[in-house]
């Protein structure tokens, strides 16, 4: 029995995309032990996925804690590392493992024993890149996020009386404020949807509080799921929604993975070929500055895409 370590940190969108290859890896190594190295904020996500024999936390802190993590990994006597993060930090880890062990390493870094070299000019999407990487190990890939396991907490659709509804995802992390379309614009979209007898459902969590409160102050006829929209609920809603509109943020990847048609509002800080969700159900409007995107332009896009 082999011991296999996956490494995955990053944003929620990265984590959601990585479930595609994590599922492929699990199907391939059916008789082996699989561990994952991740940050504390995604511990529960991977615990609920229920694929791993051990979850090891690496919050990427100071040198002393990092040494402790590396020692822990050495003690596990790992046979194969599959680096799904491919960062400068994990490249350092690979360098150390190459010096002091015979562990096989699959990744994009120069110290990988089974290295995937990608075209840096025409970079693949996250899912395609990771899929290409693990195919070097002989793993068959499906290239689709694996998320059906999320549906544990059931959403009560009686709350919306069988109305047609549309998901509104106005949030974004504070550090990515340049990817955030103004809340007042989302409020106008909500008003427009109401005029078409389509219920806007607003999703979001703590970081989105200010934006959601502003929307609610301008348009009250919405279903407000602020702090009531965990990933499983978003996934269920996405499967039945007419569509969704969103900034470039983690939940957009989840919505797109459900098959829901989603229209993204983007600035030049979003790479449409590599970072945003890919698929025929994903469309976008993009300008250098996101604040220059007009509500009227988005409404026209929604009419064309969703026949509202």
Residue ranges of each PLM-predicted region?
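Catalytic machinery of carbohydrate-active enzymes
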Residues: 1-308
């Amino acid at each position: 029995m082999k011991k296999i370590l996956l490494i995955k940190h990053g944003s929620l969108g990265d984590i959601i995309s990585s479930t595609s290859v994590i599922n492929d890896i699990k199907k391939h190594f059916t008789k082996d032990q699989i561990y994952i190295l991740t940050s504390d904020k995604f511990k529960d996500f991977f615990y609920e996925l229920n694929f791993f024999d051990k979850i090891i936390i690496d919050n990427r802190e100071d040198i002393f804690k990092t040494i402790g993590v590396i020692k822990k990994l050495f003690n596990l006597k790992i046979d194969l590392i599959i680096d799904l993060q491919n960062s400068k930090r994990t490249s350092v880890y690979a360098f150390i493992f190459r010096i002091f062990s015979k562990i096989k390493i699959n990744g994009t870094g120069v110290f990988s024993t089974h290295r995937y070299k990608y075209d840096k000019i025409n970079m693949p999407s996250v899912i395609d890149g990771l899929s290409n990487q693990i195919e070097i190990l002989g793993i068959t890939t499906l290239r689709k996020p694996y998320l059906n396991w999320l549906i544990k907490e059931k959403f009560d659709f009686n709350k919306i009386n069988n109305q047609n509804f549309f998901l509104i995802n106005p949030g974004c992390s504070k550090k990515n404020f340049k990817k955030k379309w103004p809340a007042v614009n989302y409020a106008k979209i909500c008003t427009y949807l109401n005029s078409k007898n389509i219920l806007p459902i607003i999703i979001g969590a703590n970081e989105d509080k200010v934006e959601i409160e502003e929307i609610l102050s301008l348009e009250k006829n919405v279903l407000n799921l602020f702090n009531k929209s965990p990933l499983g609920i978003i996934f269920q809603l996405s499967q039945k929604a007419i569509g969704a509109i969103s900034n470039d943020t983690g939940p957009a990847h989840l919505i797109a993975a459900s098959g829901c048609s989603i229209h993204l509002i983007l600035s030049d800080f979003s790479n449409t070929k590599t970072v945003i969700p890919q698929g025929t159900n994903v469309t976008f409007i993009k300008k250098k500055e996101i604040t220059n995107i007009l509500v009227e332009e988005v409404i026209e896009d929604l009419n064309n895409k969703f026949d509202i």
